[in-house]
């Protein structure tokens, strides 16, 4: 992965001239990341090239998080016109690899992640754009736009939308909006402060929405098997800390189903449109989460649609079940 041509001049203007620029594994977007090393110090260079990417939402949310006591990377230098940002380096120790290597730490570290959400949700929302019904519907539609055609299914898209309207509209009435980071999972949580704290990444798409969403993102992780016992214990921990009642469990499953349907569409799009074939293999896990969520009585309209439109043999890795 070659650094952007403007990187050396940008780094020189930030006081990092002559530093080594090393690639860092990226995400599912057009953004790219590089570690900048200069002697004993390091930083992260974000390349968010326009017009595909805009670093301003990331910068705004990062500054809000920092002002409110959360660990977002410090912004060291920026050039918005070129989409370049120099950030504090949180290192390489992610929650994902830590708990995979040390299962005994899973409950404790997931507890830290849940407690962070409790604190985040106690604050007033730090973004204005709402996570409303239109956004939820647009996201859920990715399933019928990408997954279904990829596996050879012709489905009733109008009934799909109606089913989501039926389950989402009651949920979205009457809750206090909180900051929803939207990709709050084990690969975006960095161990900092000697492994006692968590640093936040990949929050540029934050919206003001339902508090259950990021808990779903953490506990129904598309990239990692979270044991069901851990999921239940962490939901109980969140409810105990916030006083959330039975309605929260309903919201958890509704938003879990919506998120997982969206992810199935996104992972298929990453394969079909963006040429990233590693994502379909993650879909069987996402299907397991989705089917578990659909079993909740509040999801009956959506569950009925899936039963009528997506047969069991078409639920899995789209590269495999398309044949």
Show where each model-derived region lies.
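Active-site activation/catalytic loop segments of kinase-like enzymes and analogous catalytic loops
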Residues: 142-150, 211-244, 257-274, 286-294
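Acidic, serine/threonine- and proline-rich low-complexity regulatory regions
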Residues: 244-254
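Conserved NTP-binding catalytic cores of kinases and kinase-like/nucleotidyltransferase enzymes
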Residues: 1-84, 178, 192-199, 307-323
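Hydrophobic packing residues in well-ordered alpha-helices of helical domains and bundles
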Residues: 58, 106-113, 136, 157-164, ...
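An alpha-helical support segment within catalytic cores of ATP-dependent transferases
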Residues: 7, 12, 125-135, 139-180, ...
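ATP-binding pocket architecture of kinase catalytic cores
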Residues: 31-134, 142, 149, 153, ...
């Amino acid at each position: 992965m070659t650094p952007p041509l403007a990187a050396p001049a940008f780094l020189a203007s930030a006081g990092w001239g002559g530093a080594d620029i090393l690639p860092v594994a990226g995400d599912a977007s057009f953004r790219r990341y590089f570690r900048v090393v200069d002697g004993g110090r390091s930083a992260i260079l974000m390349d968010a090239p326009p017009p595909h990417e805009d670093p301003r939402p990331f910068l705004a949310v990062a500054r809000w998080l920092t002002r409110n006591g959360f660990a977002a990377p410090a912004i060291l230098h920026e050039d918005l016109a070129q989409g370049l940002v120099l950030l504090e380096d949180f290192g390489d120790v992610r929650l994902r690899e830590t708990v995979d290597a040390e299962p005994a730490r899973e409950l404790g570290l997931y507890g830290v992640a849940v407690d962070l959400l409790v604190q985040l949700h106690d604050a007033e929302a730090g973004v204005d754009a709402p996570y409303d019904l239109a956004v939820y519907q647009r996201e859920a539609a990715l399933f019928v736009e990408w997954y279904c055609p990829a596996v050879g299914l012709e489905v009733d898209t109008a009934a799909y939308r109606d089913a989501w309207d039926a389950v989402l509209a009651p949920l979205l009435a009457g809750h206090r909006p909180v900051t929803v980071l939207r990709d709050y999972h084990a690969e975006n949580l960095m161990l900092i402060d000697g492994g006692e704290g968590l640093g936040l990444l990949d929050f540029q798409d934050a919206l003001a929405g339902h508090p259950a969403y990021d808990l779903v993102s953490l506990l129904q992780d598309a990239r990692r098997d979270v044991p069901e016992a851990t999921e239940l214990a962490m939901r109980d921990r969140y409810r105990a800390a916030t006083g959330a009642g039975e309605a929260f469990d309903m919201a958890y499953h509704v938003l879990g189903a919506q998120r997982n349907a969206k992810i199935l569409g996104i992972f298929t799009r990453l394969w079909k449109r963006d040429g990233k074939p590693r994502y379909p293999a993650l879909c069987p896990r996402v299907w397991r989460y989705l089917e578990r969520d659909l079993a909740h009585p509040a999801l009956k309209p959506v569950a009925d649609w899936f039963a009528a439109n997506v047969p069991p043999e078409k639920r899995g890795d789209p590269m495999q079940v398309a044949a």
